[in-house]
């Protein structure tokens, strides 16, 4: 602790050996700070010293961009000296504080030292080097000086100090000139504005590409489905399947190809289960093409691509299936047919349990009132999920999903400005979908074991294998 009753004495010269102590840099820096403050107070005895010059926006972890004020503590300033309060100007208020990085290492700058914005560490390093006339071993590697490694190469660090304009004859400690502050503010605002515009353009471009890929690769989307369900289509209304008789009629026309593979003579529930599988296989093919169009997906290892699709397709299928559903039933056969919810509930066990949970999910999901542009980003985020078992390049995939989720969040804010909780609601749906798929996979295993006629499609067998 500094004896505040005693005058502060100047630093005594240190031998080079003294600098080898692990604590010497911090000790010298702290003592140097005391001397600098003492000299500054002596030079500005008129009382114009202002604490406002030490306010800046924190950029370190945990600061959350809040305003931080570096005040002079008893350990670093003489308590016997009192500074009269001086009203600060508007441009020096905390609200207008600047977030400035050290020109040498990129750490947060504590002020304008030796002619440049520098942190306390680099300020002290430069001061010691000049005062003690230190000579460092030459380094030809042009080391990159950063906060985390700034103490490793002193030669390159000092060279960086000089290259950015640090000078012992320049302003050593104190307030930034008003002209410099105004110029810096203008540069920061211009830079932030340009970066924001550039980022916004990139995000909009990504959202557009994913939306276009969605519309291109899927035969049915929400826009088409809602027109048909609302009865506004110019074509014939969908054929309604509400009992066994209408199911048989539909099998001869709408889904004739699906039931022509040796299942036409089996009972209705088995034929229905077979049709469900055929539609799932077709959607898996569409999802594969959609995934390839997601920027960055094609760069993944092929094994990772397969893993992401294996674990993500059913979550995506049940998401998109919601667009084809209302409380009374769902569209089938590209919107040419409509099968009622009541009919599906009246199928025998366990087939009656296949669709009802999907209707429950769809009613809640549709209540969010998403459009195809929202759903396309949501499906892309589902596919590019970094926590799937067996992935190789987890870090890359997590960054890929993080980017898509960020675009989704901003897109929702723009597309649904009045629903501030839409994004967290949608994230919760990801959790709900996993539970829904788990229950579906368990039901399929039950059907596979108990229904000898209900064979699984080879592609779906591969997807279900070791899934849960």
Swiss-Prot record:
GO terms for biological process: behavioral response to nicotine; cell differentiation; cellular response to fructose stimulus; cellular response to starvation; circadian regulation of gene expression; enamel mineralization; epidermis development; fatty acid metabolic process. Residues 239-466 form the NR LBD domain. The record marks 433 as: Essential for heterodimerization with RXRA. The keyword Metal-binding applies. Residues 304-433 are annotated as: Required for heterodimerization with RXRA. A zinc finger (NR C4-type) spans 102-122, 139-161. The keyword Lipid biosynthesis does not apply. It comes from the Eukaryota. Pfam families: Hormone_recep (PF00104), zf-C4 (PF00105). GO terms for molecular function: DNA-binding transcription activator activity; DNA-binding transcription activator activity, RNA polymerase II-specific; DNA-binding transcription factor activity; DNA-binding transcription factor binding; DNA-binding transcription repressor activity, RNA polymerase II-specific; lipid binding; MDM2/MDM4 family protein binding; mitogen-activated protein kinase kinase kinase binding. Expressed predominantly in liver and kidney. Phosphorylated. Transmembrane segments: none annotated. It is found in: Nucleus. GO terms for cellular component: nucleus. Residues 99-173 bind DNA. Keywords: Activator, Biological rhythms, DNA-binding, Lipid-binding, Metal-binding, Nucleus, Phosphoprotein, Receptor, Transcription, Transcription regulation, Ubl conjugation, Zinc, Zinc-finger. Heterodimer; with RXRA. This heterodimerization is required for DNA binding and transactivation activity. Interacts with NCOA3 coactivator. Interacts with CITED2; the interaction stimulates its transcriptional activity. Also interacts with PPARBP in vitro. Interacts with AKAP13, LPIN1, PRDM16 and coactivator NCOA6. Interacts with ASXL1 and ASXL2. Interacts with PER2. Interacts with SIRT1; the interaction seems to be modulated by NAD(+) levels. Interacts with CRY1 and CRY2. Belongs to the nuclear hormone receptor family. NR1 subfamily. This is Peroxisome proliferator-activated receptor alpha. It comes from Rattus norvegicus. The gene is Ppara.
């Amino acid at each position: 602790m500094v004896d505040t009753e005693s005058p502060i004495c100047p630093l005594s010269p240190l031998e080079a050996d003294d600098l080898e102590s692990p604590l010497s840099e911090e000790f010298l820096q702290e003592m140097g700070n005391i001397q600098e403050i003492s000299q500054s107070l002596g030079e500005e005895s008129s009382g114009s010293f202002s604490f406002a010059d030490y306010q800046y926006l924190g950029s370190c972890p945990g600061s959350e961009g809040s305003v931080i004020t570096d005040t002079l503590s008893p350990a670093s300033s003489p308590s016997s000296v009192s500074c009269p309060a001086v009203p600060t100007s508007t441009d020096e208020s905390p609200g207008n504080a600047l977030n400035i990085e050290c020109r040498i290492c990129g750490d947060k700058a504590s002020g304008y030292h030796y002619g440049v914005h520098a942190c306390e560490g680099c300020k002290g390093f430069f001061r010691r080097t000049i005062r003690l006339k230190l000579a460092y071993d030459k380094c030809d590697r042009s080391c990159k000086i950063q906060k985390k490694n700034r103490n490793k190469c002193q030669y390159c660090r000092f060279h960086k100090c000089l290259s950015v304009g640090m000078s012992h004859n320049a302003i050593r400690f104190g307030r930034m000139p008003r002209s410099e502050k105004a110029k810096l503010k203008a540069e920061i605002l211009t830079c932030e504005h340009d970066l924001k515009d550039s980022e916004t353009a990139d995000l909009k471009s990504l959202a557009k590409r994913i939306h276009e890929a969605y519309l291109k690769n899927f035969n049915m989307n929400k826009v088409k489905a809602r027109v048909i369900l609302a009865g506004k289509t110019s074509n014939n209304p969908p054929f309604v399947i509400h009992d066994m008789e209408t199911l048989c009629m539909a099998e001869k026309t709408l889904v004739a190809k699906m039931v022509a593979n040796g299942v036409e003579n089996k009972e209705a529930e088995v034929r229905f289960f077979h049709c469900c599988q055929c539609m799932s296989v077709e959607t898996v093919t569409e999802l594969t093409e959609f995934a390839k169009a997601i920027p960055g997906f094609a760069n993944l290892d092929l094994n990772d691509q397969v893993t992401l699709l294996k674990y993500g397709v059913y979550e995506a299928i049940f998401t998109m299936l919601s667009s084809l559903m209302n409380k009374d039933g769902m569209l089938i056969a590209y919107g040419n047919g409509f099968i009622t919810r009541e009919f599906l509930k009246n199928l025998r066990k366990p087939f009656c349990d296949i669709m009802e949970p999907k209707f429950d999910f769809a009613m809640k999901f549709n209540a969010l009132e998403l459009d195809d542009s929202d759903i396309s980003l949501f499906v892309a985020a589902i596919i590019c999920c970094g926590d799937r078992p067996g992935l190789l390049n987890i870090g890359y995939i997590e960054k890929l999903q993080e980017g898509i989720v960020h675009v989704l969040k901003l897109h929702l804010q723009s597309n649904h400005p009045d629903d501030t909780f839409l994004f967290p609601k949608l994230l919760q749906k990801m959790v709900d979908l996993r539970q829904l798929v788990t229950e579906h996979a368990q039901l399929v295993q039950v059907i596979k074991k108990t229904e000898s006629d209900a064979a699984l499609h080879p592609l779906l067998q591969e997807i279900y294998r070791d899934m849960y």
